[in-house]
């Protein structure tokens, strides 16, 4: 197997450290063709759908993609950003803003770190971003998936792709991985501040009179829990820690799971039926927050803020509040920095002095080096 071409090496070039923020992915646009291409790549991953490949290939390519692409495209169109300074998929826009803000914060703190974001499916792809980092002289990469709770369906497949790309490199960089941060104080604090800021602006639920806070996490098949995936337990711990930080009693907040796909049983309770039941019993106000999504995306903006609100109100509920994800909030950028720096310990984070680099280049050239 031929290896990827290496960037031209130059003596005196600083060895740099990078943080690679990885998220799930998004289609390039809202056309059925673009959405279908994204769905095919996403759902072809054996980490995501554990069904015999031949059977699943037929289901995916003959049934799911042809039948779901147009409906999914309409959903993406409903949440696509088209503002002057925010254009495109919300997930990509906020991921890029997170990377940019983190870069600025770390640089302001005196750390010479390159920050980039990549998507497991779609663009910017992990291979393209990792190759771009190598061209910037990056010799050390901290892979930080934007999945607070570990799951084989998300975190592991991001690592798989990083390892695959690494295996194609002739001159491999050092690598560190952040497995999860579901109970990291920096993450819990950012969640706490996000909810608190929303309540300070819009008023808090009246928990004494039955209002509820629903913490909705992305669901996975229950079978993954039975096979040893820790995702369910980590979601519950995040929910408990956030509830405690907010000063809530168990019963004032609920942990639910959304985005069920197919007929198999997934982690319960399901979000949509929970919202329907809360509406049916006459709950006056429900606030929904999605702690497992550090950036707003289709699953939060369309499935929860739009469909979830409709489900609750049609069933008889009155006041529905969707609390935005962490996105590029100041507290969250500071939180990512804390998490990253804890995993970067021992790696050089300061830029080598130009005189030292020049001396290195001069010595190399005196020995016959071309550059």
UniProtKB/Swiss-Prot annotation:
UniProt binding sites for Fe cation: 218, 299
Reactions this protein catalyses: heme b + 2 H(+) = protoporphyrin IX + Fe(2+)
SUPFAM superfamilies associated with the record: Chelatase (SSF53800)
One BP term from GO: heme biosynthetic process
Subcellular location: Cytoplasm
Pfam families, alphabetized: Ferrochelatase
Gene Ontology cellular component list: cytoplasm
Keywords of the record: Cytoplasm, Heme biosynthesis, Iron, Lyase, Metal-binding, Porphyrin biosynthesis
InterPro entries assigned: Ferrochelatase (IPR001015), Ferrochelatase_AS (IPR019772), Ferrochelatase_C (IPR033644), Ferrochelatase_N (IPR033659)
Pathway where it operates: Porphyrin-containing compound metabolism; protoheme biosynthesis; protoheme from protoporphyrin-IX: step 1/1
UniProt-recorded Gene Ontology molecular function terms: ferrochelatase activity; metal ion binding
EC number, as in UniProt: 4.98.1.1
Family recorded in the similarity comment: Belongs to the ferrochelatase family.
Its biological purpose: Catalyzes the ferrous insertion into protoporphyrin IX.
NCBIfam families reported in the protein's UniProt record: hemH
Full protein name: Ferrochelatase
UniProt source species: Ralstonia pickettii (strain 12J)
């Amino acid at each position: 197997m031929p290896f990827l071409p290496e960037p031209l090496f130059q003596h005196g070039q600083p060895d740099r450290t990078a943080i690679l923020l990885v998220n799930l992915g998004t289609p390039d646009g809202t056309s059925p063709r673009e959405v279908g291409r994204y769905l095919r790549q996403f759902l072809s991953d054996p980490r995501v759908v554990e069904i015999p490949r031949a059977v699943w290939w037929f289901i995916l390519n003959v049934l799911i993609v042809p039948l779901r692409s147009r409906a999914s495209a309409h959903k993406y169109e409903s949440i696509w950003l088209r503002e002057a300074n925010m254009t495109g998929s919300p997930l990509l826009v906020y991921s890029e803003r997170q990377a940019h803000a983190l870069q600025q914060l770390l640089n302001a703190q005196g750390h010479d770190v390159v920050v980039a974001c990549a998507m497991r499916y779609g663009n910017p792809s992990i291979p393209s971003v990792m190759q771009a980092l190598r061209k910037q002289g990056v010799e050390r990469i901290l892979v930080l998936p934007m999945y607070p709770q570990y799951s084989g369906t998300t975190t592991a497949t991001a690592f798989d792709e990083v390892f695959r790309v690494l295996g194609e490199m002739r001159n491999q960089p050092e690598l560190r991985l952040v497995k999860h941060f579901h109970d990291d104080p920096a993450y819990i604090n950012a969640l706490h501040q996000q909810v608190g800021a929303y309540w300070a602006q819009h008023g808090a639920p009246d928990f004494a009179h039955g209002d509820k806070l629903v913490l909705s996490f992305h669901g996975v098949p229950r079978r993954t829990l039975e096979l040893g995936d820790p995702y369910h337990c980590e979601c519950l711990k995040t929910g408990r820690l956030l509830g405690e930080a907010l000063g809530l009693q168990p019963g004032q907040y609920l942990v639910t799971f959304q985005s069920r796909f197919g007929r198999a049983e997934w982690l319960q309770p399901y979000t949509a039926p929970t919202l329907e039941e809360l509406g049916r019993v006459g709950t006056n106000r429900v606030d929904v927050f999605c702690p497992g999504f550090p950036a707003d995306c289709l699953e939060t903006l369309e499935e929860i803020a739009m469909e979830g609100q409709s489900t609750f109100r049609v069933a008889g509920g009155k006041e529905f509040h969707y609390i935005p994800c962490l996105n590029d909030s100041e507290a969250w950028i500071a939180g990512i920095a804390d998490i990253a720096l804890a995993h970067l310990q021992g790696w050089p984070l300061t830029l080598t002095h130009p005189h030292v680099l020049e001396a290195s280049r001069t010595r190399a050239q005196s020995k016959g080096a071309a550059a």
